[in-house]
Amino acid sequence: MAAAATMAAAARELLLRAGTSDMEEEEGPLGGGPGLQEPLPLGELDISSDEFILDEVDVHIQANLEDELVKEALKTGVDLRHYSKQVELELQQIEQKSIRDYIQESENIASLHNQITACDAVLERMEQMLGAFQSDLSSISSEIRTLQEQSGAMNIRLRNRQAVRGKLGELVDGLIVPSALIMAILEAPVTEPRFLEQLQELDAKAAAVREQEARGTAACADVRGILDRLRVKAVTKIREFILQKIYSFRKPMTNYQIPQTALLKYRFFYQFLLGNERATAKEIRDEYVETLSKIYLSYYRSYLGRLMKVQYEEVAEKDDLMGVEDTAKKGFFSKPSLRSRNTIFTLGTRGSVISPTELEAPILVPHTAQRGEQRYPFEALFRSQHYALLDNSCREYLFICEFFVVSGSAAHDLFHAVMGRTLGMTLKHLESYLTDCYDAIAVFLCIHIVLRFRNIAAKRDVPALDRYWEQVLALLWPRFELILEMNVQSVRSTDPQRLGGLDTRPHYITRRYAEFSSALVSINQTVPNERTMQLLGQLQVEVENFVLRVAAEFSSRKEQLVFLINNYDMMLGVLMERAADDSKEVESFQQLLNARTQEFIEELLSPPFGGLVAFVKEAEALIERGQAERLRGEEARVTQLIRGFGSSWKSSVESLSQDVMRSFTNFRNGTSIIQGALTQLIQLYHRFHRVLSQPQLRALPARAELINIHHLMVELKKHKPNF
């Protein structure tokens, strides 16, 4: 129906537009022709905006033309007027039908209207009820806010009362002295656990009362008298107990570590005295310091005296220096030496004293050693003495810090009050001993013992001995340097002419140096010290100069070289046993040994093969300068060299080998020298062959008598010593 209405409206508009157009064509815009049945009822039509209206009509028509029914009607050529009337008729029928339906449903509509009216009344009453309810809610919300404010105020009052109650409870609990506390302080022995527990309670109550008194609390006066009497009783019992423990240290043969351990269990006793009776605490501390300082001093003085009795009877003296000859001390009234002076400069097993296992080994027991007739070097006694000192000092320092509740400088001062006299006595004894000590190895080992003990003390977190270690090192280092300088001076001032008969074997002074230097180098490698290396460098220079001075006493260069090689080889061998291969001493003597060995080989080859050596050098020089023609005048000389070498080389090599093996004490070194000499001889003969291959000497008849180089090598290998 909507489509039909749309088509009808569109048809009317088209007809209206078409009629208007026809009228305009036939009669003009204002005329009326015979085709016009009646004038258009314009009514109140506003023609002032006809253009705008026509535009709207155009738009409306254009929209209707898009309708499918209109398009279909236009396509089929239906008469629009007739179609419009038909549609209008249908619309009227529909309208009448709708009216009849409305009339038929009028009762229902009236009933619906009544129902709507009733609903409006109900909704109005609901609105009134909701309004009243909203008003009630507003008043309730106000009451709730009032209740919340009242509740908050009550909570604040409750918390305040609880806080006051807690404070008052604490105050009352702190002021009340229970009967259990009184009975424990008055009757219980101090060693019982309940005495310690109630003593802690008494200390807390006394502190609380002092705090409340400072605030002006009047109730403190009620308990002050009771607490004071209990405090006096507790102080008296504690004082007697601690002094009794301290006095027990004085008993002979008492292990004072046991009472110390017992005191640590009751360290709160001293804390109580410190907080409640400082005069008594000071009395106990002073008594402890006085008692323990005497005990330590007596113990270490006795131990040190007994310890020195098990030292070796034979010790180094001022004449036991590196450059002093063995016969210097022998006199008419002198007794024979129980040891060789060379052992003073030898490390041997003495270095084990600084090994980790020996360093912290149990201390020596002098009477046990005396029964077993055992004797020890000074460094072993020094280690035992200072390990005991280290162990007891660490234990004492930790006890002082824990029992007397001190730390930092206060702990240092208290420690030195206890151990100061003992440490001072030990330093004086060491200073006195070092005055007549000439054993550099012993002093150097003592230095390294101190360095290691200092590290142990640092690991145990005991800094109280730091100053003592510095004082000990301040005594040891200068003495060590002095002894080393004395040895340097003794070597420097040694006159080779006063040493007796000359011998190409290693000298005893160089052997002393080798043993001594290797000992110090091996010890110094563990904790390197630059000053030590400088002093050893000075000693090495003097020993090298001494070796050269002694070598100069030999008449022949060959003997000089044999002496130098034997000494350099011996010193190098000893050093390499203990020092690192890349140490300065090893490198220096290796270079000296190589240089003198090469010179000796040339000196060794010179008598039997000197002519051959001279000719080869001269010929090579001529060839290098381009004067090879001058070799033609050397044919007779070359012939003599060829025949002389061929007839005597075997005997010369045999004599050379025997001479070398007789000259050198180190068989391995002698073998190396023979090997080098034979290698150089082969190289020399090979160079001789190259010279004879020059055109100027190639036609020499004597070349036929040359020994084949490979044959010579095979023969020379037979002279290589085998081990």
Curated annotation (Swiss-Prot):
InterPro entries: Vps52, Vps52_C, Vps52_CC. Pfam families: Vps52_C, Vps52_CC. Keywords: Acetylation, Coiled coil, Endosome, Golgi apparatus, Membrane, Phosphoprotein, Protein transport, Transport. It is a peripheral membrane protein. One of its GO terms (molecular function) is syntaxin binding. Disulfide bonds: none annotated. The modification Phosphoserine is found at S355. The modification N-acetylalanine is found at A2. It is found in: Golgi apparatus, trans-Golgi network membrane; Endosome membrane; Recycling endosome. Component of the Golgi-associated retrograde protein (GARP) complex, also called VFT (VPS fifty-three) complex, composed of VPS51, VPS52, VPS53 and VPS54. Component of the endosome-associated retrograde protein (EARP) complex, composed of VPS51, VPS52, VPS53 and VPS50/Syndetin. EIPR1 interacts with both EARP and GARP complexes and mediates the recruitment of the GARP complex to the trans-Golgi network. Interacts with RAB6A and STX10. Interacts with BLTP3B. This is Vacuolar protein sorting-associated protein 52 homolog. The lineage of its organism: Eukaryota, Metazoa, Chordata, Craniata, Vertebrata.
